[in-house]
């Protein structure tokens, strides 16, 4: 009987799989100019998603390898023809952008086995487009192992192709202002995509994509700016100065791998260094120093894997992957690739918002901010450096600090970690809304910027991973020890000088006496002294 039941269930499962509608590849319809049909077929059953209007499907971005990016689009609840639209990309690399949808900014969230409307959704006044990027993340798939990307050039080419096809199916967004956004490793995707859009517009001689700004949350922009993890853990009190010394061989090896541009070694050493620091401090994750564990990020996966939900999303039999290890590993060569020049180019044409959660250990705020001031050079840099850094308010409380000028807005969010929209949803909605509107964040009542509170920027050349001696910032004994060493050296030198002076004086006295009292001639004096 058990065998019969098992066979029946297997056949039922197989029948269900075979009955699924194939994945909806809109590219095939676009090529035939069946754009309206493509749009109609991509409609998602709203009954499964709290009656929210949305569209989903796939765009082919590499025909030879049959590589396809999955998208899910939500027109704004308060839609108007000029409503801004936001493209959201998750980090990882290799993580699904549906994590941003369900866990952070989308119209709904999945909690306690049910969908609920999100109070602080970005989707009320902005249309939201989520793309699973790169190939392999989420529902995005390829038919070939060669379909997994290894660099940002391919990544930006794929995303640009998907955006072009998307705008053909949804032409109402073509002239609307576009903001490309994301967090963490998306700090590498977004500059690459922004430059691709800029270059394509230049090539055709018109503003084809109405890109207005880039929004990056806790972005991973350059490894050298956040290489000194041991000092970061020290500053948070997670290890002491002896702990810093204990991991110094690993820290120095990681620094050297970065300077040598040894991607494989740097990737491995970073993981080993963070694991060692976490073991020493019993820090269970690096996303938020105030939280023991980050749970429930993938709770929604069980929901979208339901047959009726997969059918509604038009994914056919494509398997969903929350985080694709292959996609992650394939991007290892990009680990140390240079991003700064792309950001500098974009700052000369677009506005950029970088927000950072204060409690993040993965991409901590302070070293990243220092690197921006020191290494980024664009034509309006002086305006940013001279701008005052001021508190900003939300709900009658200081929500963080903002510095804005020369196309760059830098915001620190108090109490948030790596996933800022999840930790501080209302505050994050406020800051992106004000940025998109081009407005200043609210300041405390009666707050006045004092000129003397913003000193001229001074470039500190003593910082960086090239320093040969690891000094522990803030160690009260490090300064004392240095003074003691200098004092000892000076005292020893002084003592030697006194001894030499006494010896030389005695020798001079003997020789002078010999000359005066023993009638030693000048030749003998010279030979004795020299």
Give the ranges of each region predicted by the language model.
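Terminal and linker regions of secretory-pathway proteins
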Residues: 2-530
